[in-house]
Amino acid sequence: MLNKLSLLLKDAGISLTDHQKNQLIAYVNMLHKWNKAYNLTSVRDPNEMLVRHILDSIVVAPYLQGERFIDVGSGPGLPGIPLSIVRPEAHFTLLDSLGKRVRFLRQVQHELKLENIEPVQSRVEEFPSEPPFDGVISRAFASLNDMVSWCHHLPGEQGRFYALKGQMPEDEIALLPEEYQVESVVKLQVPALDGERHLVVIKANKI
């Protein structure tokens, strides 16, 4: 699996240390193991997880601005855990409402000794925003409109929303409230992955 990951990273132009690669593989192995009992993801094959979960998450890392992020609807830690491994200097709060997912996240935190993550079981509407976050990240969580509506209290004055999407979500962008501005839409290159991937970066015009 290490060879496959190394080839994928090379194709994506991403450089990681051996320690980071081993952490990513350990995470995939844990996800594969726990998935049999907890049904954390529909992806069953660990090699497929490397592409659809690991690479699909970490290609976002260069576009994240700031040091303090919250992964909303994190599920089994996607994209938060892969991002925390490739951005060890940043801190990631992993928010999910389901206990079984948060238990898995805490086990990953313990086994991989990830000191820059904080798994939290909560609904996003009830989660406090003090201090506010530099970035609010979501992957397959909600529409853009719902994301900014439910998470409006989380980013700081210079904070951003980072929404990981498949095809270009033009309809969702058109429905955004006027106080939110799309700063950029990045077409992501994910080697070995069929279909399009986009990152939508939204700025809240907070006064």
UniProtKB/Swiss-Prot annotation:
S-adenosyl-L-methionine binds at G73, L78, V124, E125, R139. It is an enzyme of class 2 (transferase). Keywords: Cytoplasm, Methyltransferase, rRNA processing, S-adenosyl-L-methionine, Transferase. It is found in: Cytoplasm. It catalyses: guanosine(527) in 16S rRNA + S-adenosyl-L-methionine = N(7)-methylguanosine(527) in 16S rRNA + S-adenosyl-L-homocysteine. GO terms for molecular function: rRNA (guanine-N7-)-methyltransferase activity. The keyword GTP-binding does not apply. One of its GO terms (cellular component) is cytosol. Gene3D superfamilies: Vaccinia Virus protein VP39. Its EC number is 2.1.1.170. Its main location: cytoplasm. Belongs to the methyltransferase superfamily. RNA methyltransferase RsmG family. Specifically methylates the N7 position of guanine in position 527 of 16S rRNA. This is Ribosomal RNA small subunit methyltransferase G. The gene is rsmG.
